[in-house]
């Protein structure tokens, strides 16, 4: 039981741990920021197109403000 788990853990960790983890962290941060901005723009466009949904536009504006604050803090 301990042998295969140990081997698999070392293989996965040493094989793709350090390189993939570091690159994944940087790429993940950049992708998260870009995805958040694109989602904000898409949400604003969607809320602006249907003017009848006043509730949706108000909720989206509040969420976009909160997300912008979080992005600035980060």
Curated annotation (Swiss-Prot):
Biased segments, Low complexity type: 47-74
Compartments, as annotated in UniProt: Membrane
Membrane spanning residue stretches: 34-50
Annotated membrane topology: Single-pass membrane protein
Top-rank taxon: Eukaryota
Assigned keywords, A-Z: Membrane, Transmembrane, Transmembrane helix
Region of interest: Disordered: 1-26, 46-74
Keyword Membrane in annotation: yes
Protein name: Putative uncharacterized transmembrane protein DDB_G0290657
Keyword Transmembrane attributed: yes
GO cellular component terms, A-Z: membrane
